[in-house]
């Protein structure tokens, strides 16, 4: 039996990888407009980076983390999400210092790892694109990040988008709400799922996020955090809503929304679509929020942050469902056909010269007959086919055919190697004269 990829992973093959490159390039272009710069952090970190930031009660830490003891007896974890590693790098490299412009804006792309049941759009190794903006408590930064997220999805031509927002308040708001929520849930303790029983006193907000049907029934009548906001938290959330309206970004307030990671506070948001490829109803494509205590929690100063992440696999499922011609067929500038073994050195030199000039060029390496080589040129969508046979070799010329117009000319090899643009112009002029 041959070797197979691990369960929950995927090989991204040529052709498919073109789509990934398109997604990454589009994201980089959008982020550049907002002055976000790329950051690259390790695929693995100290286990504590994720347990401290994500919270011991989160599913990621308690159930899904790939962690192990390395040969130096250090507790290591493969990154399950991007934010914690970026915050660790922000703190370790003292990017919070006054010499660095604030907000300090970064984005990341790359693989993440979670041990969960593989399904469509969800793998154990999956890829995330995310952004983080550090250093400003302004609600305008929340809205800038949301606006950028909406713009990014529009660039990907995702339709039927819905923005849902909520607030988790500041520390005082959450403390008051925690108390009210615990008081509400305690009489239902025996009815709660085992996970929710554990979370009830550690982080009762996570009970609201339970997927258990009985838990969901219980929390339907739970207190709403909007009723427990401090005046400052109310002002922050109201300003976010006002600024979204000023940008004509429609939104819904979803008071039941909580994020799956424990570090969020104030504004949280999800962008959803109703495309059936991800399941029934509205499904989240991108999610994020504000995390004002996370930098301090990982050893830095008190510095606010806000960001989002999206899964690339799920995004590509959507993009392919909505647009079958996601990436245009690649075009080859020139394919060089060699007729006879003695032409090999000349055709090799020619394709290298064309590549040196910035063109895409290829030739046969399987000693195939001319007919098979011409067939390959067509398959590769070559714009021009250059043919060198015994007579061309003797005359130091080449036969060039424009595959779009069908026009053919013979030119000196030196001209072809030195100025391919002139050859194209000659072909065009001849086409116009015919």
From Swiss-Prot:
It is an enzyme of class 6 (ligase). GO terms for cellular component: cytoplasm. Its EC number is 6.1.1.21. InterPro entries: aa-tRNA-synth_II, aa-tRNA-synth_II/BPL/LPL, Anticodon-bd, Anticodon-bd_dom_sf, His-tRNA-ligase, HisRS-like_core, HisRS/HisZ, HisRS_anticodon. The keyword Protein biosynthesis applies. It comes from the Bacteria. GO terms for biological process: histidyl-tRNA aminoacylation. Keywords: Aminoacyl-tRNA synthetase, ATP-binding, Cytoplasm, Ligase, Nucleotide-binding, Protein biosynthesis. The keyword Zinc-finger does not apply. GO terms for molecular function: ATP binding; catalytic activity, acting on a protein; histidine-tRNA ligase activity; transferase activity. It holds the Pfam family HGTP_anticodon. It is found in: Cytoplasm. Homodimer. NCBIfam families: hisS. This is Histidine--tRNA ligase. It comes from Latilactobacillus sakei subsp. sakei (strain 23K) (Lactobacillus sakei subsp. sakei). The gene is hisS.
